[in-house]
Regions:
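Intrinsically disordered, low-complexity activation-like regions
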Residues: 1-218
């Protein structure tokens, strides 16, 4: 089995030409590489020796992420699912605000991003991409759910995660985290919020009546 760092970002390769284009894939790879650097530094495996160079690199990656075009700015046919592209782009922005380009939580940015992501997902909840890419949806919903902590949007994320995780037959957090680690995920920064969210998801499972985003079986 690959190590967590080796798995990081692998999930995006399966989305090329469907949910992301080459430009987005390049940005997400840069974010993956940056995450690996941060992880190795925090675990003492390879401390960052040149903090100025690291900050410059981080700023370049963030600028590239924020410069990605919106879904409605893409050329026709550039991706098969504009809905999936936009959802992934916004989830990556949430991740950057927490990990690669951290912003203070009291600034209200996480609630704003969680609300924007929820609106995108609601607008395209019948898109067939969710049946085709349920694991990407899992990652998107977890990041949105973490960002929605202590907001009214939290319940929406919990309900949808309960449905998607049930469809994927995921009941243990460790199995969920393994799936998340194939995209953008830093355990030291995301694990705490993820576990809290998962407790709420499991509590909601017995009350699951419908899958809001249309994932019935995978």
């Amino acid at each position: 089995m690959n190590s967590p760092v080796e798995r990081l970002g692998q999930g995006f390769q399966d989305l090329l030409a469907f949910g992301i284009n080459d430009s987005a894939a390049s940005v997400f790879q840069a974010m993956t590489d940056l995450t690996a650097v941060i992880d190795c530094h925090l675990r003492g495996i390879k401390p960052i020796s040149d903090i100025v160079a690291f900050i410059d690199r981080r700023n370049v990656v963030q600028h590239s992420l924020m410069s990605l075009p919106r879904g409605d700015e893409l050329n026709y046919g550039e991706v098969s699912s504009v809905c999936l592209y936009e959802s992934i782009r916004h989830a990556a922005i949430i991740y950057s605000a927490a990990v690669t380009f951290p912003l203070p939580p009291h600034a209200g940015v996480f609630r704003m991003l969680a609300t924007l992501l929820q609106n995108i997902l609601e607008e395209c909840k019948f898109d067939p991409c969710w049946q085709l890419c349920p694991r990407a949806l899992l990652w998107i919903l977890v990041l949105g759910g973490i960002a929605s902590f202590d907001t009214v949007e939290r319940t929406w994320y919990v309900q949808n995660l309960a449905a998607v995780s049930a469809a994927l037959n995921l009941s243990e957090w460790e199995d969920v985290a393994e799936e998340l680690g194939k995209y953008l995920w830093l355990q030291s920064a995301c694990e705490g919020g993820g576990r809290l969210l998962w407790v709420e998801v499991l509590s909601d499972r017995p009350h699951l009546e419908e899958n809001i985003l249309g994932i019935s079986e995978v």
